[in-house]
Regions:
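Cytoplasmic membrane-interface segments at the C-terminal ends of transmembrane helices
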Residues: 3-18, 66-93, 109-113, 138-165
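Alpha-helical transmembrane segments
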Residues: 20-31, 142
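Hydrophobic H-region at the start of alpha-helical membrane spans
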Residues: 26, 61-62, 95, 132-137
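Membrane interfacial helix motifs at helix-loop boundaries and amphipathic/re-entrant anchors
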Residues: 32-62, 103-133
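Alpha-helical protein-protein interaction elements
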Residues: 14, 19, 25, 38-39, ...
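Transmembrane alpha-helical segments of multi-pass membrane proteins
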Residues: 22-26, 85-102
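Lipid-exposed faces of alpha-helical membrane segments in multi-pass integral membrane proteins
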Residues: 66, 99, 103, 136-137
Length: 166
């Protein structure tokens, strides 16, 4: 994982597929944590509509994770040819947020809710602290994934590890 691979590659010390895996796992963990802590802090359920069950929430997180991975890969996938921009974090955030809202909406429809209830649940999430928790999680993890690819840092070395030391 160090930058001195000897092949002359121009990307950072972490390859794009590895950065994508780390950032995606971090996003999944952080979005679940963020939704739970937001629920604890506000005293409200993430999906407060009775009878919907867990399917809309699961569908929303799965859709958000897939959108996150796709958008982040679009930002960092060709790092050998170009330097990835941190603007990719903004696009990844937008894609993840919209996919979460859309996934919850589709999940609510799948569980048998009518169109008005599904739209109400999705609208509440989009305009509440829960939507902000999803967007913030996506932004932090996308920024981190891009930073992993952009960095030119190498692993730390102690003075006695220098092979040219006398």
């Amino acid at each position: 994982m160090t930058a001195d691979r000897g092949s002359g590659e121009s990307h950072g010390s972490v390859r794009p597929p590895v950065a994508l895996a780390f950032a995606s796992m971090g996003f999944a963990a952080l979005v679940i944590f963020g939704l739970g802590m937001t629920s604890l802090a506000t005293g409200e359920a993430v999906i407060a509509t009775p009878g919907l069950g867990q399917v809309p929430g699961i569908a929303g997180v799965v859709c958000a994770l897939l959108a996150f991975a796709g958008a982040l890969w679009a930002a960092i996938g060709r790092a050998e040819e170009r330097h990835p921009s941190f603007w990719g974090a903004a696009w990844t955030t937008a894609a993840s947020f919209l996919a979460y809202i859309g996934g919850v909406w589709l999940g609510a429809l799948f569980t048998g809710a009518d169109l008005g209830v599904a739209t109400g649940v999705a609208g509440r999430l989009a305009t509440s602290w829960f939507g902000l928790a999803v967007a913030a999680s996506a932004f932090v993890c996308a920024w981190s994934g891009i930073a992993l690819v952009r960095t030119r840092a190498r692993r730390p070395r102690w003075p006695w590890e220098d092979e040219y030391d006398e």
